[in-house]
């Protein structure tokens, strides 16, 4: 059955317009770029097959446009649209930092860290420095390591924060394994950072752990109290 034969409220485009993009599954979102699908399949089934054979979503979409266009069901036009959409999303997240806007939306900050760190093959620990109105001052990657971890030095975070005259910081690091669940070591280093920054009256607002899917916020877990 072609998508045009589906009930209107189940078609990906109509569903997105009526209920927003978050209401769609990964396959439904991808189907919007796929278009008509392969012969004998609707676009959603083609998208499901792409995710099954070449997914999950992150490594699939991390491919350059030239690699995407070779996948069954995409082709040059769909690959270019996907690459352009991803780049627009990245620039949108960057724009708030470049304009020095107040960062009051934690999910957006988490997505920004994810854009910067998720594709790394080794662990990277980064810090976003903020002024007293929670406007971005700078973003720095302070520590790098191996696939198993990076050594974090709270004193260096404090030194850089003082250098930027920051009133608050948000930190984040990636898990190359793809599992974003914070480890005991992650919680321990967060406590050390809290204690060190508190000595110089700088707030640690959040610590994001980046892996596959949604970034994990330690503040949301109540682990920064």
UniProtKB/Swiss-Prot annotation:
Q: Which GO MF terms are attached to this record? A: metal ion binding; metallopeptidase activity
Q: Hey, which family's this protein in?
A: Belongs to the UPF0758 family.
Q: Which UniProt keywords apply?
A: Hydrolase, Metal-binding, Metalloprotease, Protease, Zinc
Listed name of the protein: UPF0758 protein XOO0462
- Intervals of motif JAMM motif: 173-186
Q: Which GO terms describe its biological process?
A: proteolysis
Q: Which residues form the MPN domain?
A: 102-224
Note the InterPro entries from the entry.
Answer: MPN (IPR037518), RadC_JAB (IPR025657), RuvA_2-like (IPR010994), UPF0758 (IPR001405), UPF0758_CS (IPR020891), UPF0758_N (IPR046778)
Q: Quick check: keyword Cytoplasm in the entry?
A: no
SUPFAM superfamilies registered for this protein in UniProt:
RuvA domain 2-like (SSF47781)
Residues given in the record as Zn(2+) binding sites: 173, 175, 186
């Amino acid at each position: 059955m072609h998508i045009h034969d589906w009930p209107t409220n189940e078609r990906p485009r109509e569903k997105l317009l009526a209920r927003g993009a978050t209401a769609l599954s990964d396959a439904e979102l991808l189907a919007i770029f796929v278009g008509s699908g392969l012969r004998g399949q609707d676009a959603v089934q083609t998208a499901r097959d792409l995710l099954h054979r070449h997914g999950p979503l992150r490594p699939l979409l991390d491919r350059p446009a030239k690699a995407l266009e070779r996948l069954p069901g995409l082709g040059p036009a769909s690959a270019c649209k996907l690459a352009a959409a991803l780049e627009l999303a990245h620039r949108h997240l960057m724009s708030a930092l470049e304009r020095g806007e107040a960062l009051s939306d934690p999910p957006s900050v988490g997505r920004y860290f994810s854009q910067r760190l998720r594709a790394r093959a080794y662990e990277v620990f980064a810090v976003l420095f903020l002024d007293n109105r929670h406007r971005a001052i700078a973003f720095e990657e302070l520590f790098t390591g191996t696939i198993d971890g990076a050594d974090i030095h709270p004193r260096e975070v404090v030194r850089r924060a003082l250098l930027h005259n920051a009133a608050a910081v948000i930190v984040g690091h990636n898990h190359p394994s793809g599992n974003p669940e914070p480890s005991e070591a992650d919680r321990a280093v967060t406590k050390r950072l809290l204690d060190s920054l508190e000595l110089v009256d700088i707030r640690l607002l959040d610590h994001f752990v980046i892996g596959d899917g949604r970034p994990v916020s330690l503040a949301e877990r109540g682990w920064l109290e």
